[in-house]
């Protein structure tokens, strides 16, 4: 399946790591880039593994929207599988939150 990532997810990842680098002087740009690469690799792998992850449990709006959830690098991602008119399945990642920021 093809994977599509909402702009809000990109923004959440960038803002978290920008803040982390400002607050933790030992966190360097090379380390952050490796973590971000792992996040995007994991999201791309949803094209293969999306159907095995459970229904979201972290946020109430994720639950009400019927999203599924997976976790990578302490980020929780909410996504849904859609079937297009031609029968093709796609994955759309709708939202993300880091474990440290969720209240």
Which positions does each model-derived feature cover?
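Basic, Lys/Arg-enriched alpha-helical interface segments
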Residues: 1-67
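Enriched for short, Lys/Arg-rich terminal
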Residues: 65-103
């Amino acid at each position: 399946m093809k994977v599509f990532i909402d702009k809000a997810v990109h923004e959440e990842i960038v803002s978290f790591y920008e803040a982390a680098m400002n607050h933790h002087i030992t966190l360097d740009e090379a380390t952050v880039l490796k973590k971000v690469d792992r996040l995007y690799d994991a999201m791309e792998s949803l094209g293969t593994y999306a159907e095995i992850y459970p229904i979201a449990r972290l946020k109430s709006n994720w639950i009400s929207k019927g999203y599924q959830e997976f976790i990578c690098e302490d980020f929780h991602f909410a996504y849904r599988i859609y079937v297009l008119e031609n029968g093709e399945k796609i994955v759309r990642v709708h939202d993300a939150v880091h474990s440290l920021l969720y209240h």
